[in-house]
């Protein structure tokens, strides 16, 4: 048991008979019930699978993760796969036909078409009652999806641990696929794929095997890439496509290395062993030679931008980030364009250490004032570029120009790079108010919070931006936006630019260089953005087994055809959802999906990243529910809700979410509850879906969808994030993570210590890992203590809540003062006390650093310190409007709680009960 820091709390001592109904802060999600061993205690069900044997589980997909216990005599961790040494399904001894690399009635390594495997028991269905799961066990949010249970001979190399894709890259909302469309519709569960081709910002941070010999074998009919699930036929000379069943020839180079003159073992090839792999593409995969990295910096130089410090901060950050721009082969090119009521170009002469300012005032027909010297090689012109970035703010320091011609500037930038493609990275502190694409302030007072809010405030106010974005996409040009205005900026309209060009909208409301924290956030995010290893001229296509097809696509890209998604540049911090439909009855026990991204790397190499997924099928509704992935389903419903919010109305989006939950509960009650007892609870659901109602309820209260009045720029920015975030960040954005700090274990905030035994010496060795975080607690005030200290992470910001009745010693340990009301509040940073002065301060700063540490997002999370209310609070404190607003903002993260205008999770379940019972 971990130690707890003991702060004096005599004024809060509670006798046994006065113990509160709410559990102590820091308790597990089950509030006193051991998280794994007794997780099913409140469900009134047997956590053991009973007579049904457990199936062998692909490594990496979790095992028995919803509380099933190991059998007597087994000592494996319940969240891990049990030992599989020479065992078959359910722990049985393997027969010769199950042993890897055997020839039992089929060719060596025959794959999916080898000896038929017996029918597998799929994941067991466990039922839980949502009304008895309060507070909800949020530890489920960190669990992997239900296991993918497929026959051992599905993969061509049965011993490969990576034959099925990790859910980090490729996952399905259903880990058992209905065998016909009627069953899918009856289930009311969505069938969609979540694709995330890249999981880190930089290539060197991930380890994806690559086939570098440019030998690529594809199906002649469906163009599927050879993969771990194909079948070898004719003694290994041909392979049968696992998607369309066509036979294809095995390339001779799979068996013989012509360059070295030595034989090869085809079973060693990475594409037959790994589900996520890259191919180095030959010339036939190139419409033209790979293009260099190209950045055109479009910088607002109007009075708003200059006075707020945006112009100087941006140019200084670019200067400091030049070495971070991916430029391995020294071909990266850059251009700079200042924008107010004129277009300010900067022309460079080769070999000179300066640049020439060229001003164009014709906004109707933007033209390039020089045929050369505007777009230049970064490496060859480094001194001149550095000098320009140092001098750039001085060109505009005394400006009184309040106009901002964004539309003409974008068209000019497009002209510069239309023949090679690239990125238009745009920094704006003003509303575009002159030239093509001119926008005006909308009437928020009349429409915010009203039924027509979507049409009047969230739709595009000018068709120029979408049409221009589509034009950019066809020219391989991406637009990224960094918006910092203190006033209305029409994010809803401008965000069409990144949405259809595979870019992103970054929003910094009321940004000012006077606030060091604002400067830090913008600078860090620009720098991370510039250093990201983007993929250029990319397309993404998802293929599936015969009888299925893709029917809808969600994310930031342009859908070029029925199944081809176009990305001028492929960002590494977003994910995408593809909805699937079942067109024919599926007769095979396993279906397959393959996602392939063709792209050019930032170092000039054409590559194809291929991801493969094999999923079992079933005709039983209970199999489908038992293997549904609640996080992927929540991701799908988020995209659908955003789509409805923009196309129809916010109330329609919220109603859609609630109706979806009701439909799922109705199906479960009518078809899967044992005996369908009339008096049974209407809130029963499979255990693996018990967090889905909480997530979707939280989504209805999110800034992007809630019914209250919300500034339209903030709402539009939130909708953009909801429709592009990868699942781990999306879940935190919907349901924030809350940590209790005042009673965390002594090991929290310090490097995790792992003790291992050296096999040679027999001595214990201790290694240090990452910073250990406290266990999250539920998003409700009921899990808080009025003298506590809490950290709230909502994926965008971090709030440090200091309760109004906090113990003075705790304040002193963290802030170096025992005067609660003297500590800085709002956007700030913690004081850096030395470990010998305050270990607690050191540990909390470590925790904050760990939360901010992200290898897959550019987001820098600002810290907001909030002092909670108290009956002893000085009157001058309670009258501070900024502090009151800050409290409301932080408390809005406690989504399980009831507010003045919105119901809490308990009330929501009560309302669901009435809807389902009808």
UniProtKB/Swiss-Prot annotation:
Sites where the protein binds Zn(2+): 219, 222, 241, 244
Gene3D superfamilies: beta-sandwich domain of Sec23/24, Sec23/Sec24 helical domain, Severin, von Willebrand factor, type A domain, Zn-finger domain of Sec23/24
Gene Ontology BP annotations: COPII-coated vesicle cargo loading; intracellular protein transport
InterPro entries in alphabetical order: ADF-H/Gelsolin-like_dom_sf (IPR029006), Gelsolin-like_dom (IPR007123), Gelsolin-like_dom_sf (IPR036180), Sec23/24_helical_dom (IPR006900), Sec23/24_helical_dom_sf (IPR036175), Sec23/24_trunk_dom (IPR006896), Sec23_24_beta_S (IPR012990), SEC23_SEC24_subfamily (IPR050550)
Compartmental location: Cytoplasm; Cytoplasmic vesicle, COPII-coated vesicle membrane; Endoplasmic reticulum membrane; Golgi apparatus membrane
Start-end of Low complexity biased regions: 47-84, 92-105
This protein's GO CC annotations: cis-Golgi network; COPII vesicle coat; endoplasmic reticulum exit site; endoplasmic reticulum membrane; equatorial cell cortex; Golgi membrane
Keyword Metal-binding assigned: yes
Topology with respect to the bilayer: Peripheral membrane protein
Keyword annotations: Cytoplasm, Cytoplasmic vesicle, Endoplasmic reticulum, ER-Golgi transport, Golgi apparatus, Membrane, Metal-binding, Protein transport, Transport, Zinc
Gene Ontology MF terms in the entry: SNARE binding; zinc ion binding
Stretches the record annotates as Zinc finger-like: 219-244
UniProt region (Disordered), positions on chain: 1-28, 41-112
Subunit structure of this chain's protein: The COPII coat is composed of at least 5 proteins: the SEC23/24 complex, the SEC13/31 complex, and the protein SAR1. Golgi apparatus membrane; Peripheral membrane protein; Cytoplasmic side.
Biological function: Component of the coat protein complex II (COPII) which promotes the formation of transport vesicles from the endoplasmic reticulum (ER). The coat has two main functions, the physical deformation of the endoplasmic reticulum membrane into vesicles and the selection of cargo molecules.
Recorded family membership: Belongs to the SEC23/SEC24 family. SEC24 subfamily.
Name by which UniProt lists this protein: Protein transport protein SEC24
């Amino acid at each position: 048991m971990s130690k707890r820091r003991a702060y004096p709390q005599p004024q809060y001592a509670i006798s046994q008979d006065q113990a509160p109904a709410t559990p102590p802060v820091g308790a597990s999600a089950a509030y006193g019930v051991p998280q794994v061993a007794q997780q099913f205690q409140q469900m009134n069900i047997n956590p053991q699978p009973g007579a049904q044997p457990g199936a062998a589980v692909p490594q990496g997909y979790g095992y028995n993760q919803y509380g099933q216990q190991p059998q007597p005599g087994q000592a494996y961790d319940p969240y891990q796969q049990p030992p599989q040494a020479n065992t078959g399904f359910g722990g049985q001894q393997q027969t010769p036909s199950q042993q890897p690399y055997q020839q039992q009635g089929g060719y060596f390594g025959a794959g999916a078409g080898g000896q038929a495997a017996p029918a597998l028991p799929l994941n067991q269905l466990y039922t839980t009652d949502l009304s008895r799961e309060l507070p909800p066990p949020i530890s489920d949010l960190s669990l992997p999806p239900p296991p993918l249970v497929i026959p051992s001979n599905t993969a061509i190399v049965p011993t490969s641990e990576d034959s099925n894709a990790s859910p980090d890259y490729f996952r399905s909302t259903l880990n058992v696929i209905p065998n016909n469309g009627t069953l899918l519709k009856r289930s009311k569960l969505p069938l969609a794929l979540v694709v995330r081709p890249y999981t880190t910002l930089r290539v060197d941070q991930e380890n994806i095997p690559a086939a570098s010999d440019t030998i690529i074998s594809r199906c002649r009919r469906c163009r599927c890439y050879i993969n771990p699930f194909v079948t070898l036929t004719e003694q290994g000379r041909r392979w049968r496509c696992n998607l369309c069943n066509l036979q294809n020839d095995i390339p001779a180079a799979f068996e013989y290395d012509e360059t070295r003159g030595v034989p090869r073992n085809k079973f060693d090839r990475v594409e037959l062993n790994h589900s996520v792999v890259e191919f180095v593409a030959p010339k036939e995969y190139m419409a033209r030679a790979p293009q260099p990295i190209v950045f055109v910096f479009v910088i607002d130089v109007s009075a708003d931008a200059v006075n707020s410090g945006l112009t100087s901060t941006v140019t200084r950050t670019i200067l400091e980030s030049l070495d971070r721009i991916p430029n391995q082969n020294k071909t990266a090119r850059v251009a700079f364009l200042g924008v107010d009521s004129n277009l300010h170009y900067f022309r460079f002469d080769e070999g000179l250490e300066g640049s020439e300012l060229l001003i164009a005032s014709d906004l109707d027909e933007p033209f390039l004032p020089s045929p050369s010297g505007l777009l230049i090689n970064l490496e060859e012109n480094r001194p001149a570029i550095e000098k320009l970035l140092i001098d750039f703010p001085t060109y505009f320091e005394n400006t009184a120009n309040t106009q901002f011609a964004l539309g003409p500037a974008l068209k000019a930038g497009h002209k510069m790079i239309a023949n090679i493609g690239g990125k238009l990275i745009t920094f704006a502190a003003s509303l575009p108010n002159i030239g093509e694409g001119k926008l005006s302030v909308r009437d928020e007072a009349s429409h915010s919070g009203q039924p027509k809010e979507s049409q009047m405030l969230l739709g595009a106010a000018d068709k120029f931006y979408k049409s221009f974005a589509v034009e950019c996409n066809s020219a391989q040009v991406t637009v990224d936006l960094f918006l910092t205005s203190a006033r209305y900026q029409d994010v809803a309209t401008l965000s069409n630019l990144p949405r259809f060009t595979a870019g992103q909208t970054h929003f910094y409301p009321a940004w000012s260089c006077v606030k060091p924290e604002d400067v830090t956030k913008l600078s860090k995010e620009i720098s991370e953005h510039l250093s990201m290893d983007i993929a250029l001229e990319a397309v993404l296509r998802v293929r599936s087994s015969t009888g299925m097809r893709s029917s809808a696509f969600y994310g930031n890209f342009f859908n070029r055809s029925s199944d081809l998604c176009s990305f001028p540049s492929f960002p590494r911090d977003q994910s995408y959802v593809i909805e699937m439909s079942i067109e024919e009855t599926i007769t095979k026990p396993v279906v397959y999906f393959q996602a392939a991204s063709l792209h050019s790397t930032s170092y000039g190499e054409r590559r194809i990243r291929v991801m493969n997924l094999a999923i079992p099928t079933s005709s039983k509704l209970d199999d489908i529910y038992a293997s549904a992935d609640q996080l992927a389903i929540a991701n799908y419903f988020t995209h659908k809700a955003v789509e409805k919010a923009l196309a129809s109305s916010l109330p329609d989006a919220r109603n859609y979410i609630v109706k979806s939950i009701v439909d799922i509960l109705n199906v479960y009650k009518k078809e899967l509850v044992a005996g369908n007892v009339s008096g049974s609870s209407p809130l029963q659901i499979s255990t693996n879906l018990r967090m889905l109602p909480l997530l979707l309820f939280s989504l209805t209260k999110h800034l992007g969808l809630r019914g209250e009045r919300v500034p339209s720029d903030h709402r539009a920015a939130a909708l953009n994030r909801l429709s592009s975030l990868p699942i781990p960040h999306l879940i935190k954005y919907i349901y924030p993570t809350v940590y209790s700090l005042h009673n965390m274990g002594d090991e929290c905030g310090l490097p995790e210590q792992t003790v291992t035994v050296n096999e040679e010496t027999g001595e214990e060795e201790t290694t240090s890992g990452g910073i250990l975080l406290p266990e999250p607690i539920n998003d409700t005030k009921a899990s808080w203590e009025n003298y506590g200290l809490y950290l709230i992470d909502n994926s965008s910001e971090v709030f440090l809540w200091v309760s109004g009745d906090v113990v003075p010693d705790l304040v002193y340990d963290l802030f170096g003062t025992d005067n609660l009301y003297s500590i800085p509040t709002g956007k700030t940073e913690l004081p850096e006390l030395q470990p010998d002065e305050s270990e607690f301060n050191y540990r909390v700063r470590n925790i904050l650093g760990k939360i901010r540490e992200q290898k897959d997002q550019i987001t820098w999370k600002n810290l907001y310190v909030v002092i909670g209310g108290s009956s002893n609070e000085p009157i001058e404190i309670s009258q501070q409007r900024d502090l009151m607003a800050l409290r409301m903002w932080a408390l809005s993260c406690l989504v399980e709680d009831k507010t003045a205008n919105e119901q809490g999770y308990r009330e929501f379940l009560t309302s669901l009960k009435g809807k389902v019972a009808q």
